[in-house]
Amino acid sequence: MGATGPTGAGGRATWVLAGNILAAALVLGSGPRALPPSFPALGPGSPSRPGPAGPWASSQYSDISREARGPFENGVIFQKCSLVSGQSESQTMHVQLSVNNTRTPTSVNLSNLLVLDEITGLAVKESPGNNTQDGIQTFRKSFLQVGECYSVSYTASLDPTALGTGESLDLPARLIFQSPSQNRTQLKAPFTITVEEKIMVLPNHGLHAAGFIAAFLISLLLTVAALFFLARGRCLQGGMLSRCRIQHPENKLEPSPFTSANGVSQDLSLNDQVVAILTSEEPGSMLQALEELEIATLNQADADLEACRNQISKDIIALLMKNLVSGGHLSPQTERKMAAAFKKQFLLLENEIQEEYERKMLALTAECDLEMRKKTENQYQREMVAMEEAEEVLKRVSERSAAECSSLLRTLHGLEQEDMQRSLTLDQAEDFAQAHRQLAVFQRNELHSIVYTQIQSAVSKGELRPEVAKMMLQDYSKTQESVEELMDFFQATKRYHLSKRFGHREYLVQRLQAMETRVQGLLNTAATQLTSLIHKHERAGYLDEDQMETLLERAQTETFSIKQKLDNDLKQEKKRLHQRLITRRRRELLQKHKEQQKEQVSLGEASSTAEDAVQYLHQWRSVMAEHTAALEELQERLDQAALDDLRVLTVSLSEKATEELRRLQSTAMTQELLKRSAPWLFLQQILEEHSRESAARTTQLEAEERERGQELVQGVRQRLQQDALEAYTEEQAELRHWEHLVFMKLCCAAISLSEEDLLRVRQEAQGCFSQLDRSLALPRVRARVLQQQAQMAWREAEFRKLDQALAAPELQSKARKLRSKGRGKADLLKKNLEDKIRLFEERAPVELADQVRGELLQERVQRLEAQEAHFAESLVALQFQKVARAAETLSVYTALLSIQDLLLGELSESETLTKSACVQILESHRPELQELQELERKLEDQLVQQEEAEQQRVLESWQRWAADGPGLSEPEEMDPERQVSAILRQALNKGQKLLEQHQQRVREEWQNGAVLEDSLESIEADTMASLCSQGLRLVSYLSRMTMVPGSTLLRLLSVVLPAASQPQLLALLDAVSEKHSDHTAENESSGEQAQAEQSKRRKHQVWWKVLDSRFRADLVSQGLERMLWARQKKERILKKIYVPVQERVMFPGKGSWPHLSLEPIGELAPIPITGADAMDILNTGEKIFVFRSPREPEISLRVPPRRKKNFLNAKKANRALGLD
């Protein structure tokens, strides 16, 4: 919104008119005096910001509007808008003032409206208002109803002498009105005019051409030089890469994720923050910043571990294919083709993960911002309500009491805002950590899915033999177990070293704070002694009051100057030290990263020469453990060196300042006192006493610092014990062993599985095993979130108690009532605010930590149970689908047999066919006996072949065992007594291997049995499908002969198939009709045959009517019986008394869940469980008695022998049950 106009003789200028709105006045209070608005006159319209486009340039400040939606919500919108028009030399400004009494639920009518518009510096042309001598024009309106708008407008031009170039002119407008509650309210609409200069430039085309040519030549030379150096660097790099390819032509693996520059730069950036925290000028926020840095470091460590897992999995796949090629099971061409397919799929997966990560981060950021705005809005509303209530209470108290209460209220609001900000930060960190975990789990599952899908695709294309694919998948599954164990070790190592790193950093920060406390104590002691010296001379009568005030003023001035100089020197020296520390730290860390990258590159090269995956994983384990320990040792040394340098700097400068204060006391102040006739002996006695006090104070502060340091060391040791490496590794091994037993037990429950089902089950189990680990960041963040929520809930409960006591003082205790008897409401409010502030400073009860620990344990157990339940549900669904299909086929076949019997009976009774004709029809349409006999023979052959193959495998195993022997070497030259112990030791060492072989053999037996059962079921299903098809043809033929109507046949099907749905019945009826049409097409009838069929139809019509009525009666009776049965069952269920479902926390015990550790929350409180114990769950008062069996769970991995079944007997029994 602007226009150009004359501002003088030398140039042109632009008028920028910013019209702001102070929207929505609130009627504050109901007292007789008018309260001026406390809102700042701010808005988006500023002198350097153009107004919005449109006919009227107006704006509304969002924060002001928010304040307008206060507790009364009777807002009035007051606007001053402008529009500039005309040519550059003669611009006119059209100004409009509007008062809008918006229609809200609590709006009121306004009266005695007075608008004061400042027009200083404007030449008003047309205005209905009254001008005053002070440059203000007034507008009056006696009454304004709700929903009406009052506006006035006028035109004006700017006085050329009023403003110069770049200057601003404020012309606000004010509105004063009266509400029905006799409150006078004043609103202000800021309005700013800014003059911007426009300089006319006369172009010189010759100069422009010369400048263009010179710039073009310089840029051309620079481009040529840059391309030359770039090409030279590429040539050198290409030569090095070609030499590396010549030395290692078969190394086609991708580089390790730890060699990427992104990970190194992230690590360097996070380490720079440590130096920033140590050199911070706000010691109180160091621990909070260190906590945020720990969460960021844990997230980065999770990302590094996930990248390491992906790289190892890719290398394992390449290694397995190379072993197959070397063993002759896979051709090199197929291996290259599969490697290219794997690489393409992995690249697509990485792109998908990256896109999903960006999408999730954008969504989470937007959601967190929205949540922050909502909570900030609610917090602001609560603060406004509290301020209104406090103003109402503090109306009739002294200014001192009101100022104290206002200060306490502001302090309380500041603490609440900090607590809310911390809660929002933790919630956002939890959302991000949860998103990272979900993406990591998704990537792991997709990686396994790619492997299984590519191998199945290779088998279907004929590129891979089924037995080779089976071998490869078995090796992959077995290797993935080793990979999971390796990643557990990596995670435990990272957890331990990061816990040690941040425990040491927390120790350094607190030591730094203790050192600063000691230094400040010495400074304060020296400053106190200086003033004490003057006061002692005044009390002794050697100084009068004027002299004392003069000396005190000088002493305070000198002390302030010394402290100010110390602060400035510390600030400057810390900046220099910060830069030096970062430079040295980056140099050493970068050097260490380069050394480790070289070793990791050599490890990647060694993967191509590794004999098997176990050797490759062992190399990863040793190298990563060594690198992690070396890097942590370097970072700990750098942190300690940074603290030492900072400590030396702070102590030297502080001692210098303390020495200056003491010198001021012993020289300058002593001379001033001696000039004023102070006795030397008295002065010397005071100086000696101060010297002894200084020495004692120094000794006391140093002892306190040493004691604090010992406490911090104990805290670091306790933290390291909680995150012990061996404990976490053992816990994960125990958990994986338990889940392996559970999954094997669930798998053995499956009776029949095909090869595709086995692959799907194996992939599902692999995905479940890959989720048994715990990320580094998410558990720690979740523990802090729960702790923060528990603290906020506890504090809110305490606040409610305090507010209830403030609202009803008579409910307080007698002693408290006597103490507060002489106090007024202001004293009670002050005490209430002090108690609330004290709650923020106090620690939460210990019971909250126990409650948080119980919730964390319950959440982890629920996640594990959910994985088991999901795996079990997939197996049950698979088996249920097979059983449902078989049961449906059998029921349909039984129903067809029943309908055949019914139709043949009607044909025989109506003498349409003789018995011999019926027998002939059955013999021609029912070859089921031969089908069933053939099926029985096939099943027996399959079983015999399976038993022979199993016996052959057992025989070969025993032959290998007899040929190889037990594998125990006899010790050479050893005592006979010690030979037995040595052989026994060897046998015990080989026991684990034998057990694994036995478990593998059991798994193979179960898989072979499941596959055999599935093949037998497939043969049975095919036979039953053939029988159903033949039965449908016979039913169609008989229904054509009996002339049965379609509706009657449908009701007949509903009777013999009561569990079938209407679509299934209609599909079956359509199948019968298709068979019927086939017969009709085969046997075309002539006219005489049509007349015969018509007579037959009339003959059977009576019988079908009787049968139809009987079916109707049967259906009605069956429906009534079902309704009665359902009503009785409902009544029985409602009469039962159920125990209410309680939330239980499953604690670890022998013979149950393995031991599960938790993230540390304060001091640990162990929960012992032995035998039958009564426990209080989460302090709810509910007692639960837990009984534990001392025996381990009996989980048999042996599949029971399959019982042979006689299909004919089973079919007859099922048919008899169906007819019954």
From Swiss-Prot:
Residues 355-404, 563-644, 854-875, 920-1005 form a coiled coil. It is found in: Cell membrane; Cytoplasm, Cytoskeleton, Cilium basal body; Cell projection, Cilium; Cell projection, Cilium membrane. GO terms for cellular component: ciliary membrane; cilium; cytoplasm; cytoskeleton; nucleus; plasma membrane protein complex. InterPro entries: Limbin (IPR022076), Limbin/EVC (IPR026501). Glycans are attached at residues 100, 109, 130. It is a single-pass type I membrane protein. Residues 232-1220 are cytoplasmic. The keyword Membrane applies. Residues 38-59 are annotated as: Disordered. Keywords: Cell membrane, Cell projection, Cilium, Coiled coil, Cytoplasm, Cytoskeleton, Glycoprotein, Membrane, Nucleus, Signal, Transmembrane, Transmembrane helix. Expressed in long and cranial bones, kidney and heart. Strongly expressed in proliferating chondrocytes, osteoblasts and osteoclasts. GO terms for biological process: smoothened signaling pathway. It comes from the Eukaryota. The keyword RNA-binding does not apply. Residues 30-210 are extracellular. Pfam families: EVC2_like (PF12297). Residues 1-29 form the signal peptide. Its main location: membrane. Component of the EvC complex composed of EFCAB7, IQCE, EVC2 and EVC; built from two subcomplexes, EVC2:EVC and EFCAB7:IQCE. Interacts with EVC. Interacts (via N-terminal end) with EFCAB7. Interacts (via N-terminal end) with IQCE. Component of the EvC complex that positively regulates ciliary Hedgehog (Hh) signaling. Plays a critical role in bone formation and skeletal development. May be involved in early embryonic morphogenesis. This is Limbin. It comes from Mus musculus.
